[in-house]
C-alpha cells in the first residue's frame, strides 16, 4: 500500500527539476566571475565573457555565438547556409584562445540548427538562428549563459555596450595566433542616424541599405573600430540592472570599421516570441525598475525576481507533502 508514497518521492526531483531548469540559466546569466572593463582594450581575459562561443565547421572557427541555456546557443542565420550534414559542426565553449583553448574549454557536437523562417539572406531581417547542443553543458566560471531581454528592455542611443569575437582585426588582416578573444566597447546608434550614415557616400550602382525594425546599430561614425569577418553571430551585450544582457547578434556591415558604416546587429528582443517558441523554458530578463542603470559589475548578486521559480518549487513541495500525508 506504500507504493504511491514511493512514486511521489521519485517524482519529486523530476518535478523540481522541470520547475527550476529554466531558472538555473536565468540565475546564472549575465554574471561573469572575472571583471576588467578597459575601454579601448583589445584582448579579453579568461572568464571575462563566459557566454562567448566559437562555432566551428570541420574544426575551423567561422562564426561566433552566445550560450543562452545548457543546450542552446544563439547566433546568426547567415552562418548556416547548409545544414544537410550537421556532423561537421561543433561548438567550442569556455575558451580564450582558439589555437590553445586550455583546460577550461569544452567542445560539444551540434544536434540541430533552427534558423528563423523569415530570414531571406544577407542584410535582411530575422538573421538569427538557434543551435542545439548534443549534450547539456555544466556551468562553470568560464562557461555561463548571457541574459536575453524581453521587449520591456530598452537599449538607449549612446549607451556603451560590448562586442566580442575572434574575427579579423581589419578587412585585410587575420587575427594573429594564438587568436585571443577580442573585446570592443561601442556606443549604440539610433536608427534614423544609422540610416543617414549609410546614405552618405553611397555608390550609385549599389542598392541603398536600410536599417530594419529588428536591427540595431553600434559603432563609430569615423570608423576605425568594429566587428569584422569571423565575428558574425556573436553577441553585443549591455549592462542592464546589474546583469549583462544581449542586445544584439552581429549580423552585417559594409566592410569593417569604415567611415559612416557602423556595425549592424539583429535586436534579440524583436525575436523574443520565436526564441520562446523553440525554448519555452527559457526565462528572459525584464526591467527591474523604471530606469536602467549601468553600475560597477563587481560584487553582483542574482536579482531578487529570479527567486520566483524557487517559490514555485516550494509550492510543489507543499503539495506533494500534503499528498503523502494523505497516503500515510
Curated annotation (Swiss-Prot):
Keyword Glycoprotein: yes
Gene3D superfamilies assigned: Trypsin-like serine proteases
One Gene Ontology cellular component annotation held by this UniProt entry: plasma membrane
A GO MF label: serine-type endopeptidase activity
Secretion signal span: 1-22
Localization, UniProt: Secreted
Propeptide segments, given as residue ranges: 23-37
Annotated protein name in UniProt: Serine protease 27
Organism (species): Rattus norvegicus
Amino acid at each position: 500500500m506504500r507504493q504511491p508514497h514511493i512514486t511521489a518521492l521519485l517524482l519529486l526531483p523530476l518535478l523540481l527539476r522541470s520547475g527550476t531548469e529554466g531558472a538555473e540559466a536565468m540565475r546564472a546569466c549575465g554574471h561573469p566571475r572575472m571583471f576588467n572593463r578597459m575601454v579601448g582594450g583589445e584582448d579579453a581575459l579568461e572568464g571575462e565573457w563566459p557566454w562567448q562561443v566559437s562555432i566551428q565547421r570541420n574544426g575551423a572557427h567561422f562564426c561566433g555565438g552566445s550560450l543562452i541555456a545548457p543546450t542552446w546557443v544563439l547566433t546568426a542565420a547567415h552562418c548556416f547556409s547548409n545544414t544537410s550534414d550537421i556532423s561537421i559542426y561543433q561548438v567550442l565553449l569556455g575558451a580564450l584562445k582558439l589555437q590553445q583553448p586550455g583546460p577550461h574549454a569544452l567542445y560539444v557536437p551540434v544536434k540541430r540548427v533552427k534558423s528563423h523562417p523569415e530570414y531571406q539572406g544577407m542584410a535582411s531581417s530575422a538573421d538569427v538562428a538557434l543551435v542545439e547542443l548534443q549534450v547539456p553543458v555544466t556551468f562553470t566560471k568560464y562557461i555561463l549563459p548571457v541574459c536575453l531581454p524581453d521587449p520591456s528592455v530598452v537599449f538607449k542611443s549612446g549607451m556603451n555596450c560590448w562586442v566580442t569575437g575572434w574575427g579579423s582585426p581589419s578587412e585585410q588582416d587575420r587575427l594573429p595566433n594564438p587568436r585571443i578573444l577580442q573585446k570592443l566597447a561601442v556606443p549604440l546608434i539610433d536608427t534614423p542616424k544609422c540610416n543617414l550614415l549609410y546614405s552618405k557616400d553611397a555608390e550609385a550602382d549599389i542598392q541603398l541599405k536600410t536599417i530594419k525594425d529588428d536591427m540595431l546599430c553600434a559603432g563609430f561614425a569615423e570608423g576605425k573600430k568594429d566587428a569584422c569577418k569571423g565575428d558574425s553571430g556573436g553577441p553585443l551585450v549591455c549592462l542592464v540592472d546589474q546583469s549583462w544582457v544581449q542586445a544584439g547578434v552581429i549580423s552585417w556591415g559594409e566592410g569593417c570599421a569604415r567611415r559612416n558604416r557602423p556595425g549592424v546587429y539583429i535586436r534579440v528582443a524583436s525575436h523574443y516570441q520565436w526564441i520562446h517558441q523553440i525554448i519555452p523554458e527559457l526565462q528572459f530578463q525584464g526591467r527591474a525598475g523604471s530606469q536602467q542603470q549601468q553600475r560597477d559589475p563587481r560584487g553582483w548578486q542574482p536579482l531578487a525576481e529570479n527567486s520566483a521559480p524557487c517559490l514555485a518549487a516550494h509550492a510543489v513541495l507543499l503539495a506533494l507533502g500534503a499528498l503523502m500525508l494523505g497516503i500515510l
